[in-house]
């Protein structure tokens, strides 16, 4: 899998990449990662310059949601896509919400927010090789800001973004309290993976201590994340496996 690396090992600071990691591990599919450090390098595999990119049996698969759909087709057991049409629709809505709403709050707080950007530069970007580490942070911040403005989140103030993110956490916690063990029912789905991939990043205290505290204040979310990761014992969280992440491309 082609990805942007994380703080350690083969982890990633990209929720879409983390979502694919989770799906591959859950389905027991062996894989390797290759860490890139610029969209220009990624364009060798995906003309859009976006990760993740999964290379499988001579095919190039792009877009995390499309990759999960294809993994389900090729490796149906254990399933991540429910058979029941109503549950399947709910899981799809949850995944899309995580990808198109929750994710962009995280991007804003990591790249647009001044303190979040400072932490990214000092704790993550300094691992890049010279001279990339001098150039890449500013380029990445401008690209994130531009994308967020087109998407809409970038037009909001930091105060509004943080408030709306908290409301999202409240909605998730409310859904889980006294309800089924997973977001779409009794079984893990691709919707759970999409939300967990974002919240894992937001729970990384080194980079996002404020959002980590917000998650910790909601026991239902903490318990649900633990439940999800209990089914994914070989998935390291964004900074946990202890091995430095070298860029490889």
Where do the protein language model's features map onto the residues?
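A non-catalytic, amphipathic alpha-helix used as a structural packing/dimerization or gating element
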Residues: 86, 90-93, 160-167, 171, ...
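GST-like domain detector, emphasizing the conserved glutathione-binding G-site
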Residues: 1-133
